[in-house]
Amino acid sequence: MSEVKLLGIEEIEQEVFTRWDITGHQVNRHMLSKALTGTEGVVLDQITFPPGFVHHMHRHPHADMVVIPLSGVVQFLGVPGSPIEVSPGHVLVIPRGNWHEISNVGTVDSEVLHFFTGVGAVDDIGYEAYQQQGQAAPPLGGGR
């Protein structure tokens, strides 16, 4: 039997995350995973998206994604679709395999709880950047 754990969010180390398909950076606190806490079937991060942040169009083939804003507003864009503002009081559910882009078009940081379900480790989520005819992902609001 696993033991009960009480985690202080401020005690969890922050990781500044950048990559070729991200405009700006995000700040992650890895909170739940099989390796960290013994939880199976869910990966949970607290993520801060600074103003101007964009994680360009991509998908996760092996995990459903859930985003719960704690502060600020994030903008979600699917393919096809129109931008949707997601703010505190909302729960955004993105089923596995769905193309999506998330950005902070506001003037203050957006902080979210970010879950992947059906997996116990980040490496199991799967990741594919959006490519069409050799082009990079479309910009937010790019009409796809």
Please place each PLM-identified region on the residue numbering.
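Asparagine-centered strand-capping/turn motif at beta-strand->loop junctions
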Residues: 103-106
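Short, conserved beta-strand element in jelly-roll/cupin
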Residues: 47-50, 59-76, 115-118
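Short acidic-glycine-tyrosine-enriched beta hairpin
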Residues: 80-96
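A short beta-loop-beta micro-motif enriched in histidine and acidic residues
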Residues: 34-43, 51-66, 80
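A short, N-terminal "cap"/entry segment at the start of jelly-roll beta-barrel domains
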Residues: 1-42, 56, 127-144
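A short hydrophobic beta-strand segment most commonly corresponding to one strand
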Residues: 46-47, 93, 108-124
